[in-house]
A protein has these predicted regions:
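Generic detector of N-terminal low-structure segments
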Residues: 8-12
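Glycine-biased, small-residue-rich flexible motifs in mid-sequence functional cores and linkers
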Residues: 16-22, 102-402
Length: 402
């Protein structure tokens, strides 16, 4: 095709594509498909030429003049096929209520943009506009092991609860995985805090599958979102989890590691946050607990600040407690319970609360034995206290004060 014919064809193609999504967005999506694993190269090309649309005009020879010989991805030279694929990708994402947000958008997260390996763009699935989700508010990433202990779960919930006492309300960022991630997401949702789940799959699928209901709850809650820089249809491959950790670390001004082995995914996220010059916090644990080895290692190496209580954690983050404190809120709810406003006599409730407070992890059978109350009565009280957010219950029906 001659140069004149190509230019005419290119203009017609561009005009046709501009109508639905905007040509620059389609070009950015195309670059993400071709260079998603090398975002720094895409960013350099855009900076050099001024726009993704200008990048898509180049042929192989022109690209090699900029990047050097033998450095051009074959996918990048098939412009027509790549642009058509990108347009289909945007339509597919839209079917799931997702938009493609790129670094040229005003709503693209400012802290993420600072990272040298920031994604070219990412898909955002939410009932809110990106401008609302990534508005000027604190973002705190909370990560850790999938095999979270009762101690880790309790402190994860406490620390998220403490975030609910500050204003403006921070956004809790995590990865939707088992254990620590989902604990942080659910506690945030229960307290009305915004939360973002960064996924290692396409925006059209949820991993793990048992978290689908949680993911849909996040996507349908105002101010919350599911995000991914992977195209639709991407499977949950191991390397995808490693790469998505950079987004979890990059979105936030601080990362909190709850529990992790020395080589856990949470450790990787914490190290990335440290490399981005962000604040890193870690929950110290027993020296003989494998799940705390990563946290203790970071603290010992001065890569992370030890979290010893909720108040100092908030102070270190520089967050102002502008709303009712979580501790005061919990005490007020307990007073309401003890006044007989919840499920029966205050004396029985006080007995249950005292036993749970003194015996962290006590199960229902032991509560029945020690309280002298009937099983049905104990079960009803515990359920009511859980609904009030005063105690937490795990899958084994073990109880703890929140």
């Amino acid at each position: 095709m001659c140069r004149v014919c190509f230019c005419l064809y290119f203009r017609l193609k561009k005009k046709a594509m501009e109508n639905e999504f905007g040509y620059e967005r389609i070009c950015r999506c195309a670059l993400n498909l071709a260079l998603g694993y090398k975002p720094a190269i895409a960013a350099a090309l855009i900076d050099h030429l001024g726009s993704a649309a200008d990048v898509m005009k180049l042929d192989r020879e022109e690209l090699e003049d900029i990047l050097g010989p033998f450095s051009v991805e074959d996918k990048l030279t098939d412009r027509d096929g790549l642009l058509e694929k990108a347009e289909k990708e945007l339509r597919e994402a839209a079917r799931y209520g997702a938009v493609f947000l790129h670094a040229g958008d005003a709503a693209y997260p400012a802290l993420l943009r600072e990272c040298e390996d920031a994604p070219i763009g990412f898909y955002c699935r939410s009932c809110s506009a990106p401008e609302e989700i990534f508005a000027r508010r604190p973002f705190i990433s909370i990560v850790g092991t999938r095999d979270i202990s009762l101690y880790g779960r309790e402190w994860c919930e406490r620390l998220v609860s403490s975030l609910s006492s500050v204003s403006p309300a921070p956004c809790v960022v995590s990865g939707l995985a088992l254990g620590t991630d989902v604990c942080a997401h659910l506690r945030a949702l229960d307290l009305g805090l915004p939360t973002i789940a960064v996924m290692a799959t396409g925006i059209d699928s949820i991993y793990p599958a048992q978290h689908r209901n949680y993911a849909m709850r996040i996507a349908s809650t105002p101010g919350c979102a599911l995000i991914s820089d992977y195209p639709c249809g991407t499977a949950p491959l191991k390397n995808n989890f490693i790469r998505r950790n950079r987004i979890i670390a990059g979105l936030s001004s601080a990362t909190l590691l709850i529990e992790s082995k020395i080589k856990g995914g949470g450790m990787m996220t914490a190290r990335l946050a440290f490399s981005y010059d962000r604040e890193v916090y870690a929950l110290p644990g027993r020296i003989d607990d494998l799940r705390s080895q990563g946290c203790n290692y970071l603290i010992k190496g001065n890569m992370a600040e030890a979290v010893t209580d909720c108040g100092s954690f908030l102070d270190s983050l520089g967050l102002t407690r502008g709303r009712e404190g979580f501790r005061e809120c919990r005490e007020r709810r307990m007073e309401a319970v003890l006044d007989g406003k919840l499920a029966g006599s205050s004396e029985d409730v006080a007995t249950i609360l005292l036993l749970v407070k003194r015996n962290r992890g006590i199960d229902l059978d032991e509560l029945v034995r020690r309280s002298g109350l009937e099983y049905k009565r104990v079960s009803a009280l515990v359920t009511a206290l859980e609904e009030e957010g005063i105690i937490g219950i795990d899958l084994l029906r073990r109880c703890r004060i929140l």
